[in-house]
Amino acid sequence: TEFIQANAPEVRSRWCTNEKTAMEAALGMSYAGKRSLVCMKHVGMNVAADAFVNSAITGVNGGLVVLAADDPSMHSSQNEQDSRFYGKFAMIPILEPSTQQEAYDMMPYAYALSEELKLPVLMRVVTRLAHSRAEIAVHEPLAQKPLSPDNERTHWVLLPGNARRQYATLVEKQGTLLSKSEESPYNSEFNNQNSK
């Protein structure tokens, strides 16, 4: 937070009581048309689950990226839970960078995907990536989006009639999500002929 405040004063950052309130705050900004990022550990996804899963049904207005830091081998956590299961359960796009450069480059891609599909995007990183650093090639930051609230309450209030309609929309988007995944520049296969 202090780094952001010192180096990017136009970006608003905040600490929240817990992961659920952080998810709700980010979702509220997204509903108002602003891009939002919410970060938490994998076990924090359990706390944020209600707001997270329902955000896939309401959809988003401004791009929303949920960054979850998983901890394979339990270096500093009580379990090895895999956040990708939450993304699959919520039926939203999941990105998984393997290097610091990929993590940096995927963020604008994640926002573009979120805004195009009107869905939150889950970005999963692991301990070795989250607790490391490297030089990266930087690019121009994304332009800020103005507040542009969508005041149609049926989009954001999940009463049963609205929820059924919104859920049907989410299900209809699954074919598009599959196509986007197959076309993604970050979804590639490497065949190392020299590996043993």
Question: How does the language model describe each region?
Answer:
Residues P97-K196:
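Flexible, low-complexity linker and terminal segments
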Residues T1-Q100, D105-M107, V126-L129, L142, ...:
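Thiamine diphosphate
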